[in-house]
Regions:
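C-terminal substrate-binding/catalytic lobe of Rossmann-fold NAD(P)-dependent oxidoreductases
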Residues: 1-106
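C-terminal helical cap and adjacent loop that interface with cofactors, partners, or active-site loops
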Residues: 81-140
C-alpha cells in the first residue's frame, strides 16, 4: 500500500447501489483507497437525458444546496486538504461530455469528521426542522 492508490469494487459498489436506489439510477463511480489517514475523494458520473452546460449545472447544484451550510459547491475540482478537520462536503470539478451526455464531478469529505456520527446528527436536525449544522463542530 505504501506510495500507492488502489481502486476497488470497480462495478456495483455498495454505495453506488445505495445512490441508485435512493437518488439517481444512472450514476457510476469507483472508490479508491490510498495511504492517507483521513479523507474520501469520489469521482461520480451521471448520464443525462439531454445536453446541458457547466453554468447550468453549477446553478442547479448551488440552488439545490443553498440551505445546506455544510455543503460547498465550487468550479474547480476539490482536494482533500480543503476539508481536512471539517464537517463540510465540497462538490466541484464539473465537466460535461457532450458526445455521451455525461456529467463528471468530484466530491470530498473528511471521513473522520463527516462520518456516521455527524451524518446522524444532520439527519436528526433535518427530521426536526433544525439548521443542518446545529450541534456539529464548526468547519475551519
Amino acid at each position: 500500500m505504501s506510495d500507492n492508490v488502489i481502486a476497488y469494487s470497480l462495478v456495483d459498489h455498495l454505495h453506488e447501489r445505495e445512490v441508485k436506489k435512493h437518488c439517481y439510477e444512472k450514476i457510476l463511480f469507483t472508490p479508491h483507497v490510498a495511504e492517507f489517514f483521513r479523507g474520501i475523494l469520489m469521482t461520480g458520473n451521471f448520464f443525462l437525458t439531454q445536453s446541458t452546460s457547466i453554468p447550468k449545472i453549477m446553478q442547479l447544484f448551488e440552488t439545490f444546496y443553498v440551505n445546506h451550510k455544510l455543503i460547498q459547491i465550487q468550479t474547480s475540482a476539490p482536494n482533500l486538504q480543503q476539508v481536512r478537520d471539517t464537517s463540510k462536503v465540497i462538490i466541484g470539478g464539473f465537466e460535461f461530455d457532450t458526445k455521451l451526455n455525461r456529467l463528471s464531478f468530484c466530491c470530498v469529505i473528511d471521513n473522520l469528521l463527516k462520518g456516521a456520527a455527524t451524518q446522524a446528527i444532520q439527519n436528526l436536525n433535518s427530521a426536526f426542522g433544525f439548521e443542518d449544522n446545529l450541534g456539529i463542530i464548526k468547519s475551519n
